[in-house]
Regions:
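Short, charge/polar-rich alpha-helical segments
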Residues: 17-36
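Amphipathic alpha-helical coiled-coil segments
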Residues: 69-88
């Protein structure tokens, strides 16, 4: 590949990686938010359990609801992690495609140049 081809490829790949980083950061932020909410729920579970025991009440329904919410939030985290993996894979494919296109363009230019030189030598 010629220097300019390499520069174009580097620019395309940098753009690809930047877009990938932005998309991944959105999901990482969502994961962080879910993890914080889970921590709050753990605290609420402890408080609800203590209060129920201290007052001699049954907190099963409240605790079950909070446990379900934690499970739901953990499921969201898994979904977000899958999305991040998909973004990484798509970015990698895009960069591989960029490289293949750049190599094909360079090869086509080299073949055209060789054909032109062959034409000149025949004259």
């Amino acid at each position: 590949m010629v220097f300019m081809d390499k520069m174009k490829l580097a620019a395309k790949n940098a753009d690809s990686k930047a877009g990938e980083a932005v998309d991944k950061s959105k999901y990482k932020s969502k994961i962080y938010e879910e993890e914080n909410e889970i921590k709050k729920l753990y605290s609420k579970i402890g408080e609800a359990y203590y209060t129920a025991k201290a007052e001699g009440k049954d907190a099963s329904a409240d605790l079950d609801a909070m446990v379900k919410e934690i499970d739901d939030r953990k499921a969201k985290i898994v979904e977000y992690e899958v999305k991040i993996k998909e973004i990484e894979e798509a970015g990698q494919k895009e960069r591989e495609q960029n490289k293949a296109e750049a190599e094909a363009a360079a090869k086509a230019r080299e073949e055209a140049k060789a054909a032109k030189e062959a034409e000149k030598s025949e004259e």
